[in-house]
């Protein structure tokens, strides 16, 4: 009998996307091929505590479960030891948001010399920062929404022109979006059309990050595609999102099973538009050096222009998440998708072992 691969499934975390991570972890655990993998859940509570494996299993069964015996992680050695767990062959992090998909957790895995699913350190950090993603996308000719960035020190200077709605509107128009540069799932994002809304949106966004982006509003329909793999990635088809409320795709729209947003897979679009969405996704995936997986989001304008909005290098695996749905439509069912993601992480690790790290 082939020995099963021991998977450390890490979920939760001190993040604004904690609930999404719990649901994603639950779904991955239910769908993973139990004939190939033994799963060892590692639950990080929203307060930053590590729960026991027993309690981690409980929250996978019931996402509302509260930890009874948390272990506060005071230093890195406590995490690296991962006491009371068997030897982990590969980690599957599904910790969304800050510390989970920004390169921090990935760096820890590198220190531990363990394979892991998803982006390596550089790509995780670059795609978490929306401004860096835009700069890299422009490098390969992929259109992005025009923007300005505001750092914390600029926000603290109340005479800074970037805080003046009318002056910013001269560049971006009066219809804008304000968003934290290093958050996902529309957390802290607001649509503004006047000075009062602008001031309130900046205050809200700076609760989540020390850098905030102000973007022009790009009219149109949100379209998404999904990418799987390392050096020769597979790009899935294209999905289309329609929000019945007539507003942008909010955190609740993305993850609530009762969301009013409608997901159409495949999108009812001309083939040339589909080809552009997919080719742009491939270009962005490669220039950001993504590996494993990513969901690439864009806006399709009324005149047929495809404008990149976000690279989500650790997409959700909730009941309504677009990433697994797009690959299911492409002929890769949920269980096989998880297997391929794990294999991609292990393949990258095996390759890195062949590289020299010192001069002979």
UniProtKB/Swiss-Prot annotation:
Alphabetically ordered keywords of this record: ATP-binding, Cell shape, Cell wall biogenesis/degradation, Cytoplasm, Ligase, Magnesium, Manganese, Metal-binding, Nucleotide-binding, Peptidoglycan synthesis
An annotated Gene Ontology molecular function: D-alanine-D-alanine ligase activity
Subcellular localization(s) per the UniProt record: Cytoplasm
Domain ATP-grasp: 134-343
Signal peptide (UniProt feature, chain positions): none
Cofactor annotation remark: Binds 2 magnesium or manganese ions per subunit.
EC number(s) stated in the UniProt entry for this protein: 6.3.2.4
Ligand binding (Mg(2+) 1): 297, 310
Record: residues binding ATP: 169-224
Gene Ontology CC entries for this record: cytosol
Cofactor dependency: Mg(2+); Mn(2+)
Catalyzed reaction equations: 2 D-alanine + ATP = D-alanyl-D-alanine + ADP + phosphate + H(+)
Top-rank taxon: Bacteria
Gene Ontology biological process terms, A to Z: cell wall organization; peptidoglycan biosynthetic process; regulation of cell shape
Pathways per UniProt: Cell wall biogenesis; peptidoglycan biosynthesis
Record has Oxidoreductase as a keyword: no
Function: Cell wall formation.
Protein name per its UniProtKB record: D-alanine--D-alanine ligase
């Amino acid at each position: 009998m082939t020995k099963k691969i021991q998977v450390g499934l890490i979920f939760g975390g001190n993040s604004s996307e904690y609930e999404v991570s719990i649901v994603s972890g639950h779904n991955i655990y239910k769908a993973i091929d139990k004939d190939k993998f033994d799963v060892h859940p590692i639950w990080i509570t929203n307060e930053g505590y590590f729960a026991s494996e027993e309690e981690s299993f409980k929250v996978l069964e019931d996402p509302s479960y509260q930890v009874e015996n948390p272990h506060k992680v005071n230093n890195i050695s406590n995490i690296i030891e991962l006491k009371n767990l068997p030897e982990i062959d590969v980690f599957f992090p599904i910790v969304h948001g800050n510390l989970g998909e920004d390169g921090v957790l990935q760096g820890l895995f590198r220190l531990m010399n363990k394979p892991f699913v998803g982006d390596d350190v550089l790509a995780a950090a670059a795609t978490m920062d929306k401004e860096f993603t835009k700069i890299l996308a422009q490098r390969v000719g992929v259109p992005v929404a025009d923007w300005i960035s505001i750092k914390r020190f600029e926000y603290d200077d109340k005479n800074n022109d970037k805080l003046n709605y009318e002056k910013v509107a001269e560049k971006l128009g009066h219809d804008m979006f304000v968003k934290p540069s290093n958050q996902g799932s529309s957390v802290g994002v607001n649509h503004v059309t006047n000075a009062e809304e602008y001031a309130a949106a900046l205050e809200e966004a700076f609760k989540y990050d020390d850098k905030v982006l102000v973007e022009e509003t790009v009219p149109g329909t949100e379209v998404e595609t999904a990418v799987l793999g390392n050096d020769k990635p597979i790009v899935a088809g294209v999905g289309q999102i329609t929000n019945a409320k007539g507003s942008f795709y909010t955190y609740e729209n993305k993850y609530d099973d009762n969301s009013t947003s409608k997901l159409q897979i495949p999108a009812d679009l001309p083939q040339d538009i589909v080809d552009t969405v997919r080719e742009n996704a491939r270009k962005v995936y490669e220039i950001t050096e993504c590996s494993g997986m990513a969901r690439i989001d864009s806006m399709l304008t009324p005149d047929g222009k495809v404008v990149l909005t976000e690279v989500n290098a650790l997409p959700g695996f909730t009941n309504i998440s677009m990433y697994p749905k797009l690959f299911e439509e492409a002929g890769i069912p949920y269980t096989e998708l998880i297997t391929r993601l794990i294999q991609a992480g292990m393949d990258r690790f095996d390759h890195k072992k062949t590289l020299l790290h010192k001069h002979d």
